Amino acid sequence: SFIQDLPFSKNHFHKYLPLFPFAIEQFDLSKYDLIISSSHSVAKGVITSPDQLHISYIHSPMRYAWDQMNIYLMKSSYKKFGINLFLRFILQKLRQWDYVSTVRVDKLIANSTFTAKRIKKYWGRESKIIHPPVNTNYFTPNNNRGEFYLSVSRLVPNKRVDLLVKAFNKLHFPLIIVGEGPEKKDLEKIANNNIQFLGFQEDTEIKVLM
């Protein structure tokens, strides 16, 4: 979309969140009979015609616009009154758009039972559940693995890796965290010595850790 051409969008695209709905609606998909979107934010909001079939694979209703709004607003950079108030207004508008735009989808597919419940609660619609595929022939337990717990995740607020870190700070069990994200530095600051951050790892390395 046009957002990728805006200043600093490569590393700070989330700053343009208020523009996401407008951006997704600019895509011209008129030459396609079938539209399949994969959405945790705005992808489901593409505009289609009555003659097109739109199937959307949903990973979640827009978390930061619904039940996890306050988690995002608790970030230190958002706590100033003026910024916080403005973001609350923006997120409330996004919540309205998130709800209204679901009528554009003909068939909703949820990636889990939990997501299906969220779709029903926030959008009032039923969905079919298809779990994300995992190559179980490739990802198998490593009999030579070390004695530690493993977490593989994006380090973003909604994943609540901070709760994991706080729990292992108290348990003192060894924990390895794989993943990158804006929360990484804050998590490293609160983590004890029993917790190790490896950053991004290829599947080959994750397989060894498993």
Show where each model-derived region lies.
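Active-site donor-binding segments of glycosyltransferases and PAPS-dependent sulfotransferases
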Residues: 1-44
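Acidic anion/phosphate-binding donor-loop and adjacent secondary structure
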Residues: 117, 121, 128-129, 133-147, ...
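Nucleotide-activated donor-binding/catalytic signature segment of Leloir-type glycosyltransferases, i.e.
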Residues: 185-208
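Short hydrophobic "strand-cap" motifs at the C-terminus of beta-strands
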Residues: 111, 151-153, 178-179, 198
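Conserved donor-binding/catalytic core segment of Leloir-type glycosyltransferases
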Residues: 134, 140-176
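Active-site proximal beta-strand in glycosyltransferases
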Residues: 34-37, 48-79, 128
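A short beta-strand/loop micro-motif in the catalytic core of glycosyltransferases
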Residues: 36, 104-112, 176
